[in-house]
Amino acid sequence: MADRDVQARAAALRREIERHNYAYYVLDAPTIPDAEYDRLYHELEALEAAHPELVAADSPTRRVGGQPLAGFKPVRHAVPMLSIRTETDTTAAGARAFDVRVRKELGLAPADPPVEYAAELKFDGLAINLRYEAGVLVAAATRGDGETGEDVTQNVRTVRTIPLRLHGDAPPAVLEVRGEVFMRRDDFERYNAQQRAAGKPTLVNPRNGAAGSIRQLDPAIAGQRPLSFYAYGLGEVVGWPDAPATHGATLDALQGLGVPVSAERCVCNGVDDLIAFHDDIAARRDQLPFDIDGVVYKVNAFALQRELGFLTREPRWAVAHKYPAQEQLTTVLGIGVHVGRTGALTPVARLAPVFVGGVTVTNATLHNQDEIDRKDTRVGDTVIVRRAGDVIPEIVATVLERRPQPEPPRFNILQSYPVCPECGSHVVRLEGEAVARCTGGLYCPAQRKQALLHFASRRAMDIDGVGEKLVDQLVSRELVRTPADLYRLPLETLAGLERMAEKSARNLIQAIETSKSTTLARFIYALGIRNVGETTARDLARHFGALDALLGANETALLGVRDVGPIVAQSIAQFFAEPHNLEVVGKLRALGVHWPETTGMQQSGGILSGKTLVLTGTLPALTRDQAKERIESAGGKVAGSVSKKTDYVVAGEEAGSKLAKARELGVTILDEEELLALLGSNKKNG
């Protein structure tokens, strides 16, 4: 037998670990570092291993483990776990109908005071009955048929938010706590991400994840699932002399005993408060960290609950007021694609019409090829479609047991859509990307607005006056199909557009004309090649010097450009391999868009090649962007901070800490005049 000191230490460790468990899992406010928690836990494990007689039913070490079960034993509930009635009207009228029934049963006149109710969430998980004797969790059972459930004690012990021992010195002799085991959305997503990374099966949704975990025959598997629990009522109670007289006070008391209770609850004075609660939760439903399918109203006073009694298997004093379902079953009638403004081809399932999330849904996104493969969704399949709030409906799972025979073929975007359905350009899927894309960025109608706005933007062709509203008009009236069409717009056409008088039209024509004289770097950036930003565009311009040299470069040649990797090289090569894009580039050149060209760094390096510069302060003549462009055109790199690797710091007025750092490190400091002198022999590269 262990001596008293060992017994006392084990008991103290159990209390301390459970206190930290409550703070971490229930309050979400850890009180000690993980390493210290692990030290306490391992100390208790070692004590119990050395003294098996010390192992108690409420020990934290008993949460996870145990032998796999052959099956679940039936458990008869001391107090039946009855279901509550569901109000079919999901509007405010549903709450009013419940209030009318309650007041009628209680014999209240219209002039009598309002009934006090308790309102709470209807969690979307698995109902569980927890039995505590002398404050220790001794059994847990599912609802079952209401009279008899299944013994899931071993699995429930693995749920970290469920206390194995109640707080307080004088718990009731018997206390049955009823509530819901569920899975938070973030825990669900995190678990599925880990499963996918390990190549293991994922869970369909949080509800199935919670129910399936509790009904695992192997408690070790249940212990790996991130489950949570909230209490919402009582079963059998013995020896609780100061038991509360209302439902709301009971939930407060349970919280005081260490049992998790949702904060999303209130005591309501009459039906108007119920409706306000219902509407408030409805507005925030999608922001809650877990799934719910409605709210529950209960007459608050237990004395009135007893007076109202039951109707067959349902209490007259409670009702579930549901929201429109966010998930439903339907059938996939076909799979097509939607071409987005960036050229992404998103697979879309055409569905047999189904009412979900308050609307009739006929289409749902399948996201990308990886998601189609993961869910194995095919035409003819029965699927679970979800629509939450304003979120685009999506297919969350395929019901494989209902797949038609013979099995329909798998869907593959590149096989079904080798060319873009909008413009006929080639469709590709870059290595490492989940999305298939149209390569006709300058030509594709679906990408037209985005391509035009990017082409005219300040850092690209810098056409002042070309904004979203103008582009909307130009595209909707079919005046512009590609960027080349901007250079053909007549004055009278522009002057006839909304909010475009003749003076504005003349200014725009002048801006378009001015933009014809540009730099090769700006022109490359303006083309909107995927993965090619300003810096890469400048690197390409410096390296090749001339557009024709770039057009003739294969992926191997592109990999020779500074900071261009395989994905960027592939993206550039595929863009210029698309005839539609080359056609637009040719038209732009024919319409007078031009730039200075050089032999490129393939044959001659820039004067600042391999040098790193830092800009600080305000320069007298050059803007920061202009200075950066000149430096990069000369082969230099502009960094954001000063280090030992910095070659020059260019300082203007009100230079700050970067200048001080440069002096400290002995870095050469230039003013604007000295920078321009250094760049003097490289002006032709701008």
Curated annotation (Swiss-Prot):
<dbReference type="InterPro" id="IPR010994">
    <property type="entry name" value="RuvA_2-like"/>
</dbReference>
<feature type="binding site">
    <location>
        <begin position="34"/>
        <end position="38"/>
    </location>
    <ligand>
        <name>NAD(+)</name>
    </ligand>
</feature>
<feature type="binding site">
    <location>
        <position position="322"/>
    </location>
    <ligand>
        <name>NAD(+)</name>
    </ligand>
</feature>
<dbReference type="InterPro" id="IPR001679">
    <property type="entry name" value="DNA_ligase"/>
</dbReference>
<feature type="binding site">
    <location>
        <begin position="83"/>
        <end position="84"/>
    </location>
    <ligand>
        <name>NAD(+)</name>
    </ligand>
</feature>
<dbReference type="InterPro" id="IPR036420">
    <property type="entry name" value="BRCT_dom_sf"/>
</dbReference>
<dbReference type="Pfam" id="PF00533">
    <property type="entry name" value="BRCT"/>
</dbReference>
<feature type="binding site">
    <location>
        <position position="298"/>
    </location>
    <ligand>
        <name>NAD(+)</name>
    </ligand>
</feature>
<feature type="binding site">
    <location>
        <position position="444"/>
    </location>
    <ligand>
        <name>Zn(2+)</name>
    </ligand>
</feature>
<feature type="binding site">
    <location>
        <position position="420"/>
    </location>
    <ligand>
        <name>Zn(2+)</name>
    </ligand>
</feature>
<dbReference type="InterPro" id="IPR003583">
    <property type="entry name" value="Hlx-hairpin-Hlx_DNA-bd_motif"/>
</dbReference>
<keyword id="KW-0479">Metal-binding</keyword>
<dbReference type="InterPro" id="IPR012340">
    <property type="entry name" value="NA-bd_OB-fold"/>
</dbReference>
<dbReference type="InterPro" id="IPR013839">
    <property type="entry name" value="DNAligase_adenylation"/>
</dbReference>
<dbReference type="GO" id="GO:0006260">
    <property type="term" value="P:DNA replication"/>
</dbReference>
<feature type="binding site">
    <location>
        <position position="423"/>
    </location>
    <ligand>
        <name>Zn(2+)</name>
    </ligand>
</feature>
<dbReference type="Pfam" id="PF22745">
    <property type="entry name" value="Nlig-Ia"/>
</dbReference>
<dbReference type="Pfam" id="PF14520">
    <property type="entry name" value="HHH_5"/>
</dbReference>
<dbReference type="GO" id="GO:0006281">
    <property type="term" value="P:DNA repair"/>
</dbReference>
<protein>
    <recommendedName>
        <fullName>DNA ligase</fullName>
        <ecNumber>6.5.1.2</ecNumber>
    </recommendedName>
</protein>
<keyword id="KW-0234">DNA repair</keyword>
<dbReference type="GO" id="GO:0005829">
    <property type="term" value="C:cytosol"/>
</dbReference>
<comment type="similarity">
    <text>Belongs to the NAD-dependent DNA ligase family. LigA subfamily.</text>
</comment>
<keyword id="KW-0235">DNA replication</keyword>
<dbReference type="GO" id="GO:0003911">
    <property type="term" value="F:DNA ligase (NAD+) activity"/>
</dbReference>
<dbReference type="Pfam" id="PF01653">
    <property type="entry name" value="DNA_ligase_aden"/>
</dbReference>
<feature type="binding site">
    <location>
        <position position="438"/>
    </location>
    <ligand>
        <name>Zn(2+)</name>
    </ligand>
</feature>
<dbReference type="Pfam" id="PF03120">
    <property type="entry name" value="DNA_ligase_OB"/>
</dbReference>
<dbReference type="GO" id="GO:0003677">
    <property type="term" value="F:DNA binding"/>
</dbReference>
<dbReference type="InterPro" id="IPR018239">
    <property type="entry name" value="DNA_ligase_AS"/>
</dbReference>
<feature type="binding site">
    <location>
        <position position="180"/>
    </location>
    <ligand>
        <name>NAD(+)</name>
    </ligand>
</feature>
<feature type="active site" description="N6-AMP-lysine intermediate">
    <location>
        <position position="122"/>
    </location>
</feature>
<keyword id="KW-0862">Zinc</keyword>
<comment type="function">
    <text>DNA ligase that catalyzes the formation of phosphodiester linkages between 5'-phosphoryl and 3'-hydroxyl groups in double-stranded DNA using NAD as a coenzyme and as the energy source for the reaction. It is essential for DNA replication and repair of damaged DNA.</text>
</comment>
<dbReference type="InterPro" id="IPR033136">
    <property type="entry name" value="DNA_ligase_CS"/>
</dbReference>
<dbReference type="InterPro" id="IPR001357">
    <property type="entry name" value="BRCT_dom"/>
</dbReference>
<dbReference type="Pfam" id="PF03119">
    <property type="entry name" value="DNA_ligase_ZBD"/>
</dbReference>
<dbReference type="Pfam" id="PF12826">
    <property type="entry name" value="HHH_2"/>
</dbReference>
<feature type="binding site">
    <location>
        <position position="143"/>
    </location>
    <ligand>
        <name>NAD(+)</name>
    </ligand>
</feature>
<keyword id="KW-0436">Ligase</keyword>
<feature type="binding site">
    <location>
        <position position="120"/>
    </location>
    <ligand>
        <name>NAD(+)</name>
    </ligand>
</feature>
<dbReference type="InterPro" id="IPR041663">
    <property type="entry name" value="DisA/LigA_HHH"/>
</dbReference>
